Amino acid sequence: MRNIYLVGFMGSGKSTVGKLLAEKLGFRFVDIDQEIEKEEGKKIKDIFREKGESYFRDLEKRMIERFLGSKNLVVSTGGGLGADSENMRKMKENGTVIWLDTPLETVFERCKGDDERPLLKKNRKEIKELFEKRKKIYAQADIRISTEGKSPYQIVNEILGRIR
């Protein structure tokens, strides 16, 4: 079966849903952020601080390309990875892209107090602008799943119903 790529803003549940979905499908789960941390030997926030966002975005692109030729993967992308048109095109060519659409207020609630997310250092207005900009690219996904008011298990079951 083709790969499944989960896209969405930070805090949308990509990693949580991805692990559960991979388990249900018998697929391997890949978290791009974790793969980057493993390769760099540093936390994402430290990569951002030391080398900047554009360096990190290049790492994301290289990392996703590593998995494009594989099969039977559920891939949790970083929030910015799926917000790049070129990355979106490549993922769609290689698999099914699923957007976990989560309202911004829910994202704020889930992420408050999380100092591991460098983009939360921005003010609310900047985050809202980034959120709106990224939504336009996330909307190119093959499948949109609203996560509002749903448990990770409900989201996984909805995905399974849509991909089978």
Curated annotation (Swiss-Prot):
<dbReference type="GO" id="GO:0005829">
    <property type="term" value="C:cytosol"/>
</dbReference>
<protein>
    <recommendedName>
        <fullName>Shikimate kinase</fullName>
        <ecNumber>2.7.1.71</ecNumber>
    </recommendedName>
</protein>
<keyword id="KW-0057">Aromatic amino acid biosynthesis</keyword>
<dbReference type="InterPro" id="IPR027417">
    <property type="entry name" value="P-loop_NTPase"/>
</dbReference>
<feature type="binding site">
    <location>
        <position position="117"/>
    </location>
    <ligand>
        <name>ATP</name>
    </ligand>
</feature>
<keyword id="KW-0460">Magnesium</keyword>
<feature type="binding site">
    <location>
        <position position="79"/>
    </location>
    <ligand>
        <name>substrate</name>
    </ligand>
</feature>
<feature type="binding site">
    <location>
        <position position="134"/>
    </location>
    <ligand>
        <name>substrate</name>
    </ligand>
</feature>
<keyword id="KW-0808">Transferase</keyword>
<dbReference type="Pfam" id="PF01202">
    <property type="entry name" value="SKI"/>
</dbReference>
<feature type="binding site">
    <location>
        <position position="15"/>
    </location>
    <ligand>
        <name>Mg(2+)</name>
    </ligand>
</feature>
<dbReference type="GO" id="GO:0000287">
    <property type="term" value="F:magnesium ion binding"/>
</dbReference>
<dbReference type="InterPro" id="IPR000623">
    <property type="entry name" value="Shikimate_kinase/TSH1"/>
</dbReference>
<dbReference type="GO" id="GO:0009073">
    <property type="term" value="P:aromatic amino acid family biosynthetic process"/>
</dbReference>
<keyword id="KW-0028">Amino-acid biosynthesis</keyword>
<comment type="subunit">
    <text>Monomer.</text>
</comment>
<keyword id="KW-0418">Kinase</keyword>
<keyword id="KW-0963">Cytoplasm</keyword>
<dbReference type="GO" id="GO:0008652">
    <property type="term" value="P:amino acid biosynthetic process"/>
</dbReference>
<comment type="function">
    <text>Catalyzes the specific phosphorylation of the 3-hydroxyl group of shikimic acid using ATP as a cosubstrate.</text>
</comment>
<dbReference type="GO" id="GO:0004765">
    <property type="term" value="F:shikimate kinase activity"/>
</dbReference>
<comment type="similarity">
    <text>Belongs to the shikimate kinase family.</text>
</comment>
<keyword id="KW-0067">ATP-binding</keyword>
<keyword id="KW-0547">Nucleotide-binding</keyword>
<dbReference type="InterPro" id="IPR031322">
    <property type="entry name" value="Shikimate/glucono_kinase"/>
</dbReference>
<feature type="binding site">
    <location>
        <position position="33"/>
    </location>
    <ligand>
        <name>substrate</name>
    </ligand>
</feature>
<keyword id="KW-0479">Metal-binding</keyword>
<feature type="binding site">
    <location>
        <position position="57"/>
    </location>
    <ligand>
        <name>substrate</name>
    </ligand>
</feature>
<feature type="binding site">
    <location>
        <begin position="11"/>
        <end position="16"/>
    </location>
    <ligand>
        <name>ATP</name>
    </ligand>
</feature>
<dbReference type="GO" id="GO:0009423">
    <property type="term" value="P:chorismate biosynthetic process"/>
</dbReference>
<dbReference type="InterPro" id="IPR023000">
    <property type="entry name" value="Shikimate_kinase_CS"/>
</dbReference>
<comment type="pathway">
    <text>Metabolic intermediate biosynthesis; chorismate biosynthesis; chorismate from D-erythrose 4-phosphate and phosphoenolpyruvate: step 5/7.</text>
</comment>
<dbReference type="GO" id="GO:0005524">
    <property type="term" value="F:ATP binding"/>
</dbReference>
